Amino acid sequence: MGKKKIINKNNPEALKEAGNKAFASLNFKEAINNYTLAIEIQPNHIYYSNRANAHLELN
């Protein structure tokens, strides 16, 4: 059985990394969710850019 990594939801960089992994796995909705949570904690142009890319891939 695979282990699921616990994400620190108060760490925007950890959320970005989780979003990147979801994006790489083609799970764009999960990626968008993680990037959005990161933005809510610490607005950052990279998080916005990553989220925009995930939206483009989703559509």
Where are the regions a protein language model picked out?
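Alpha-helical tetratricopeptide repeat
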Residues: 1-59
